[in-house]
Amino acid sequence: KVSDKKFNEALKEAKNYSSEVIIEKSFNGPEYTVALLKGKPLTPLQILHDPIRGFYDYEAKYNSQNTQKIKIEDESIVKRLKEISEKVFDCLNCKTWARVDFVSEGEKLAVIEINSVPGFTAKSLFPLAAKYSGIEYKELISLIIEDC
């Protein structure tokens, strides 16, 4: 993530490694994630970044005590996230499980990626979404294996 002031400097640095550089718009709103099991969305989650780190990197994701993953209270956002994630899952011909990640700004929601083999550690988002949906870890594993 680069500020406008440091953009040219960062672009020059990136071009030291490759002549081709990917530049993405930064969204300043909340980040969301929706885990899908057999094409059906589980409880969508909002990711509240560690305010000290300011960016959801490896450290913030796995080691920070300040990063939070919470249920979304706004039902209209939950509905939109579920609808979009189901379309993405189907469009990409996913089968058993996946996780769709979103960024937002104002009313805009943007899909940033789909994880066709999402993380599955004790701190991962997929098992947490399943737990909030009433599916315990062992049952989740069984459901995934049964569908393969």
Question: Language-model segments: which ranges?
Answer:
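Conserved metal-phosphate-binding beta-hairpin within the catalytic cores
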Residues: K25, V34, F89-A122, A130
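Aromatic/hydrophobic pocket-lining residues that form π-stacking "cages" and hydrophobic walls in ligand
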Residues: A10, S85, F126
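Short secondary-structure capping/turn micro-motifs that flank functional sites
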Residues: P30-E31, E105-G106, E146-D147
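Phosphate-binding site of ATP-dependent enzymes
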Residues: D4-R80, L109-A110
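Gly/Ser/Thr-rich helix-start
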Residues: P30, F120, I135
